[in-house]
Amino acid sequence: MKLSNNQIRKIKRRLEHTQASAKRRSKDFNLDFNYIKNILDQKVCAYSGEPFDNRIEGEKLSLERFDNNVGYIKGNVIAVKKKYNTFRSDYTLEELIEKRDLFALRIGRSSAKKVHKLNLDEKKWAKIKKTYNQIKAIQKKRENRIEHISQLSKSKQTSDIKLRIIALKARIDGSRIAEGAEVVKLNVLLKGSDWKIVKKLSEAEMQYDMCDKIIQGVERYQNLSFIDKLKLKRGYPLNCSIFKLIRG
């Protein structure tokens, strides 16, 4: 399909802007007109699968380097929502995982919300119950470990006792991270229209959710098949058909 003059100008502007950004950051650059065109043609975010919405700033399409150690080169630049691009900044995958765990730890310190069944099908209700019960089980284990520490603290503080207390404290912190992840999962389920929402997701929960989506996206793009890598080198999304890839 022939491009309009306005479309051509838009692609050229984005290409020039991206090249300037690469130069400013001293990054390699080899993108071209067709690559940018294919990126801008994409309809959903490469990280989350959510559709782009040009009416909302954070929902707009932006160009992201999924490997921050590599420049603006073909196969490393993908289409993601601006809010995810901004949130990620220059964080590595390891740094993102560390941030996600901190958000989960913050969330996990608060008690899980009580839920009430409304008009839900059994399959969804089963997911709710499973997640809620998992949260309660994590909390119960943590309470037992806290009680165990209390008992050990009353004992003679031998080297063995001290090591056991340290191990228990580590497990308690780990349980808060695990609980935080389950609370986020529960709140995502609560966002459905069949549920009465009393409280919106907290700032930490929203940041955890964004961080988790980016991590899953980056991990997916770091483990691609040969065909998927070819798709990216053309600026196509991973769900692009083989026919389109061959046709070019």
Swiss-Prot record:
It comes from the Viruses. This is Uncharacterized 29.0 kDa protein in dda-modA intergenic region. It comes from Enterobacteria phage T4 (Bacteriophage T4). The gene is y01B.
